[in-house]
Amino acid sequence: MNSTSFRSCCFATASLLAVLPVAFAETPPASQPPVIRMAPAAAGLPALPAVLRNETQDQQDARLQWFREARFGLFIHWGVYAVPAGSWQGKPTGAEWIMNQGKIPVADYRAFARQFTAAKYDPEAWAQLAADAGIKYVVITAKHHDGFTLYDSAFSDWNAVKASGAQRDLIKPLAEAVRKHGLKFGTYYSQSQDWVNLGGGKGKTEPWDEAQKKGDFDTYMKTIALPQVRELLDKFNPDILWWDTEYQMTSERARPFFDLVVAHPHLIQNSRLGGGVLGDFRTSEQRIPASAMQGRALEVNMTINNSWGYRSDNLNWKSSQQLIRNLSDITSKDGNYLLNVGPTAEGVIPQPEIDRLLAIGRWLKVNGEAIYATRGGLYVQPLNWGRTTYKTRAGGKTTLYLHIWEWPADGKILVPGLKQTPRSGRLLAGGVPVTTTITDSGLVATFRGTAPDPDVSVAVFEFDTPLEITNATALPTDTGASGTLLDPSKSPPAH
C-alpha cells in the first residue's frame, strides 16, 4: 500500500490526467452502449472519458453482483518485509514500506528473502479461517512495492521460488483452498512501484541505491509489470485484480493493462490502475466515507492494527466491537469491508487477528442476513442509534434491518421519515418480537429488555411495499477520479 506523501502526489496526478484525450473503449454495437464514467476535470480542462468495458449497464450489474453481495473480504499483506518485521538497524521503521522508509540497500533487502521461509504456512487453515469469519473473498499481495512475487515468475527471479527460503509457489495453494471453501479469490499487484527490479518506480522517492538507477520505467512496464500481470491472470484466473499506486501511469502506459483486464469477462478491478481508468469499484483506504454514493461500488480497506504487513511491535489491536461496527457502517453505506491481516515470515497469522476474525464470524452467524446481499444508503447521514440496510424482494416487498449500536434506555428507536407499518418485526438474536407505531416523525420501534448483543443488535422488519422515506436527502454521486480520497483534506496513515 502507499505512504502519505506518495498518496498526495498520486491524487494530484490523477486530476491532471483529465487533460489526456484517450478513451479506453472500442466502438460498441448500437445495441450495446458502453457504460461511461467521466473522470473529473482539472479547472478549465476537459474531462477524460473512462470507459469500463464494452457492456450494457445490465451486463455490468451482473458481473458485479457477487461483489456487491459479498460485503466482507480478507486482505493479506505477506512478503519479504515480514522478515525485518518493522525494525531496521535497531530502529522501528514501517512494515511493508520498510525498504523505502529505511532506505535499505537492494542487496541487504534481498538477503532478507532467505529468512522468508513460510515454514508454517497452511493455506487450508487460512481459507478455513476466512470461511469461519464469514469472509466471502480473499485478496493477497501477489507483488507489493518491493517487487517480490509470491509465485514463480518467468520475468524476474526475485520471487518466492527462486529467491526465498520458501522455495515454492505460495499463491496457487491458497487460491485452490479459498475456492474449495466457495470463496472468491483476488490478487493484489503493484504495477508502478517496484523498488528492486530494474526500472521500477520508486513512488515520490528518489532512488536510494545505485542499483536502482539502472533501467528505465517504460522498459520495466513492458518487460516485467505487464508480463507478470498476464502471468497472474493465466496462472490463477483471479476474480479481482487489485492495483495499487498510480505513479507515472499515463493513459498510454495503462492501456495494455486495461486490455488484459477486458480480455477476461468476469474480472473485476479496483480504482488504482491510473491513466484515467476508474475501475469497477472505488477504493477508500483506512477511512469509512461519510455517506453512501450513487455510482460505482465501494470497498473500504482497513487494518486490524496500525500496519498492513507484519510488524512485531505493533500491538495496537482494534477491538472486535469496533471491527463489527465498521462492517455494519460500511455495509450501511453500500460498501464492502476488506479487512487486512499480516502474517509472519513463517506464514503464521497473529493470534489477535485470528481471534478478532472469529468474533466477527460468530456475529455474522446470527446477523449475517443484515449484511450479505443487502443495500445501504437509505440515509445520507448516520443515525444516532446505529445504521440501516435493506433488501428488496419480488412483488415490491422490502426487508429492513436496523443495526442498533446504542440500545435505547427507554426501549424506543425512531426510524425517521418512514411512515409505513411493517407486517412483522423481530430481533435476529432470539427472535423476540418488536412492536411498531407510526408518528409524525416516522416509525417508532419498541424493544423489550436489554440488548441481545453488546456489539451490534439487529432488528428485522418485513414490509409488503417498497420503502418510502419522507424528507430524505439525495445521495451524492460518485464522480471521483481513480482512487480519489473521499476527504482530500485528510491524508491517510502511512501504508
Q: Language-model segments: which ranges?
A:
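Mature catalytic domains of secreted/periplasmic carbohydrate-active enzymes
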Residues: E26-H495
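N-terminal secretory signal peptides that target proteins for export/translocation
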Residues: M1-F6
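Bacterial N-terminal signal peptides
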Residues: C10-P21
